[in-house]
Structures are given as structure tokens and as C-alpha cells.
């Protein structure tokens, strides 16, 4: 159990017709305001663990950085809930970058990205890895077994970067998008290649989740939950295999089925 993920709190638990006084683990909720080059960039409500990775991954997802070398300096003030980031020369553009702009589809098969920065940074996956069906099941089981923070609180999302053979790193957060940003930040900080990896995820596969996977360059996304229609439309166009409802010995493959191998 991460000391930063939860806090013990007295509760009254109703059981067998009466209340019992107990202590329970409650997931921490923490606002983190990110400033970039002296300007407020965003405030993220998150779990206060691995905040450096969260900031790096979030900035990369937003298109503000490509690698950690784009960051000249970063200070995390965990007590006050601030992250101060200074980008290297030629980094973040001026004010227009802070306001997201809607980009709709134009003509032909143009992608229906939500925002301009998504259009710039999402990658179409060509090739990608293959995964055996049995390995999909084994990896989801491993995520569940190693998700100690969720087991204690019931209030956290978990995301793992893995090869078809083993877990590489697991991150947890109250926000499913934050858990993915922490993975992204970990990979950038430690220079971990992502193209030969997959994501194992506990949450719903929304369009935002799918776009984060695309920006990381990951070709396979496994989830125990359901996808949304827009997520699957994007997965089709971006070349990402989405596996959902991965529970027990069964799962659904929604897009690019050829990457999942039977036998």
C-alpha cells in the first residue's frame, strides 16, 4: 500500500442490522496546479504519488513536450499542491496553447479529433506487437493481483505497461487518465521504449484514454471494462487493438483482431 495513496479514517459500517465502528482506507484526493514558464497551465485532481511522472506524462500528452530534454527545470511542492515547470528555449508557445480548440472532421476520412493538440501528437500505429490470448488473460490477472491500493480503498484506477511476457511498471490514481499519464511520464523519464509494449488497464476505454495510448505509440490496449463508440472509431483509424471486458477466461476484441493470437 502506497503511503501517499490512502489515509485511514474512522467509519460506521452497517452489518447484520447494526453499526460497527471501524477504520477504513480512503483514497486521497489532491489538487495539483501545474505552472509552465510562470503561467498556470492546468489543475489536476489526482492521487499524490509519482507526481513528477504525472506532470511529465500530462505535458507530453498535451503536446507541450516530446522528451524530458524539453524540460529545463521542474519543482514539485507537494505541501502546497504546485508543480513549477520551466521549459527549454523554443518550448511552449504563447497563450494560444493553453486554450484547447475543437477540430471537427472536414471531408473524406479526416479524423474526428477533439482538439488541435491531439491531432498533432496522436500517432497512427503501423505493425505493432502480437499477444497470445492466454497472455492477455494472465496479464489482467497480474494487474489485479498487484493492485494493492485498489484492494485497500476500492477507489483507484490502475494501469500497467507490459510486454506480452511480464509487467514493466504499474501506476495507480483516482483518475484513470492520470494513471496513464504516470505511465507515460515514467517511460519518458527512464527512456523506456513503448512501441514494443502494451497497456493493461482497469478503467473504461474512452476516447481520451485511447488518444493517450496513441500518443505513447502503444498498439494494444487491454481493459477489464467497456470501450465507447468514439474510442473504437479512433482505434480503427489509429491502428490500435482494443480488448475489453477482459474478465476471467473471456474477453472481447473490438478492433484490429489480428494482433491477438489463439494457441
Swiss-Prot record:
GO terms for cellular component: cytoplasm. The active site is at 107 (cysteine persulfide intermediate). GO terms for molecular function: sulfur carrier activity; sulfurtransferase activity. SUPFAM superfamilies: Cytidine deaminase-like. One of its GO terms (biological process) is Mo-molybdopterin cofactor biosynthetic process. The keyword Cytoplasm applies. Keywords: Cytoplasm, Molybdenum cofactor biosynthesis. It is found in: Cytoplasm. Gene3D superfamilies: 3.10.20.10, Cytidine Deaminase, domain 2. Its main location: cytoplasm. Required for formate dehydrogenase (FDH) activity. Acts as a sulfur carrier protein that transfers sulfur from IscS to the molybdenum cofactor prior to its insertion into FDH. Belongs to the FdhD family. This is Sulfur carrier protein FdhD. The lineage of its organism: Bacteria, Bacillati, Bacillota, Bacilli, Bacillales. The gene is fdhD.
Amino acid at each position: 500500500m502506497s503511503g501517499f495513496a490512502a489515509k485511514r479514517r474512522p467509519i460506521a459500517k452497517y452489518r447484520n442490522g447494526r453499526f460497527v465502528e471501524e477504520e477504513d482506507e480512503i483514497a486521497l484526493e489532491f489538487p495539483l496546479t501545474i505552472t509552465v514558464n510562470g503561467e498556470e497551465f492546468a489543475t489536476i485532481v489526482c492521487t499524490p504519488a509519482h507526481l513528477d511522472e504525472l506532470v511529465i506524462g500530462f505535458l507530453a500528452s498535451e503536446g507541450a513536450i516530446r522528451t524530458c530534454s524539453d524540460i529545463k527545470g521542474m519543482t514539485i511542492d507537494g505541501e502546497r499542491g504546485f508543480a513549477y515547470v520551466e521549459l527549454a528555449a523554443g518550448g511552449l508557445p504563447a497563450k494560444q496553447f493553453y486554450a484547447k480548440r475543437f477540430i471537427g472532421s472536414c471531408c473524406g476520412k479526416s479524423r474526428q479529433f477533439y482538439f488541435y493538440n491531439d491531432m498533432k501528437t496522436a500517432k497512427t500505429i503501423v505493425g505493432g506487437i502480437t499477444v497470445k490470448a492466454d497472455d492477455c488473460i494472465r496479464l489482467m490477472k497480474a494487474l489485479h493481483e498487484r493492485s494493492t491500493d485498489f484492494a485497500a480503498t476500492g477507489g483507484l484506477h490502475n494501469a500497467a505497461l507490459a510486454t506480452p511476457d511480464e509487467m514493466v511498471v504499474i501506476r495507480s490514481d483516482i483518475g484513470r487518465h492520470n494513471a496513464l499519464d504516470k505511465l507515460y511520464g515514467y517511460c519518458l523519464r527512464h527512456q523506456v521504449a513503448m512501441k514494443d509494449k502494451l497497456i493493461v488497464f482497469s478503467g473504461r476505454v474512452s476516447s481520451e484514454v485511447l488518444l493517450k495510448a496513441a500518443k505513447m505509440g502503444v498498439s494494444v490496449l487491454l481493459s477489464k471494462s467497456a470501450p465507447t463508440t468514439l474510442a473504437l472509431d479512433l482505434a480503427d483509424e489509429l491502428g490500435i487493438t482494443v480488448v475489453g471486458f477482459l474478465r476471467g477466461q473471456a474477453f472481447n476484441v473490438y478492433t484490429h483482431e489480428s494482433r491477438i493470437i489463439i494457441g
